[in-house]
């Protein structure tokens, strides 16, 4: 089987003929978010379940001893990442956050000091086309805790602006392509009409006299 990476770099071999229709020179990039994020967050059954506080567990290194898992969990948090799962739904999350432990920060994303024996975590990401925030805590010994997903209004507005701009640019390029295609079609009709007139007069251009000799 051909290597997928090689396939990704392959370019179709197209030869453009005299009257071949011009190809579109743009690709619509898949958007990161859906058009109405808040509505989906409030109506989607999965989001409705995950928006309620429920049990979460650390899921990393399950085959290792509890002592080693505790160490790896704390080290991962200090590096700014961890793995967690909502027990009731089985939804697994790869959480990434700012692990800065500056005591003067008022809104830490990873806070070992807020409550003894626990780490409080906030992580921002896009899930199923919706900007959300994980908020919860995990016990440093048991490696379980409580968490939920919240709708991230600020980042949703930012991503929505990007989406609108992306759609506007796509529509503009689509209009430009349609104009080019229309101009090509009009030129093709003019050329074909010129050919028909040349044939009706007994030849095409200068070459007509050659055929009459």
From Swiss-Prot:
The gene is Bgb. SUPFAM superfamilies: Core binding factor beta, CBF. Belongs to the CBF-beta family. This is Protein big brother. GO terms for biological process: regulation of hemocyte proliferation; regulation of transcription by RNA polymerase II. InterPro entries: CBF_beta, CBF_bsu_sf. Regulates the DNA-binding properties of Runt. GO terms for cellular component: core-binding factor complex; nucleus. Keywords: Nucleus. It is found in: Nucleus. One of its GO terms (molecular function) is transcription coactivator activity. Gene3D superfamilies: Core binding factor, beta subunit. The keyword ATP-binding does not apply. The lineage of its organism: Eukaryota, Metazoa, Ecdysozoa, Arthropoda, Hexapoda. The keyword Heme does not apply.
